[in-house]
């Protein structure tokens, strides 16, 4: 199932996004009653996808990000691979959905895109063994860990650099069953203004999905809807006013966001 969050003529709701991926004109949004956790029930209302607006598919209580999880990205940033996952938090106020502008702060330059596979937690969990991680995952989506590099380098810690409003685009929906694809080996591609900037596979992660969930859940309780961004491969680079960033992950879809400088409409 593809679970989205939509603004329809009747308000905001979760919905099952039905139809062939890549054929938006033939896709529909089927409204889910209440929330998508457990076994969703449906209201009976539906709309053509073109008649609704896709929002961020989930409003997480927290966004946990994994840094330094691809060797090639570590190399391009001049670091060394960590023995254990390196994690940090983004505020949930950074979350935006598809086609919503990434707003560049006036006092930040350069600002980089970072295309990532994102895990969506399906139920409250703590101290989850790696082998049981899948039992606690609702599904997968796409994230962009937008980062103000000058602030990241000057501050020594990453909260300001990665916590600005709009610095966590997520979407376009949550895929609960990736079969026949394997989340441990998905193609990831980031395109800026039509130029391919990142091209990798999730199999190149240093710490895999099970290890990530085990590590984070040993530290903090994960709640339904929490997001885990699993790290970015090499190829990150600057985005500027007027750019368009599209991140595509095999089996999930494409997350696209325009870029504007703060203060512009």
From Swiss-Prot:
Key words, A-Z: Metal-binding
Domain of life where this protein originates: Bacteria
Binding-site residues, a divalent metal cation: 114, 116, 145
Listed cofactors: a divalent metal cation
InterPro entries hit by this protein: Fumarylacetoacetase-like_C (IPR011234), Fumarylacetoacetase_C_sf (IPR036663), Rv2993c-like_N (IPR018833)
Metal-binding is among the record's keywords: yes
GO MF annotation: an example: metal ion binding
Pfam families reported for this sequence: FAA_hydrolase, Rv2993c-like_N
Family statement: In the C-terminal section; belongs to the FAH family.
PANTHER family linked: ACYLPYRUVASE, ACYLPYRUVASE FAHD1, MITOCHONDRIAL
Record's protein name: Protein Rv2993c
UniProt source species: Mycobacterium tuberculosis (strain ATCC 25618 / H37Rv)
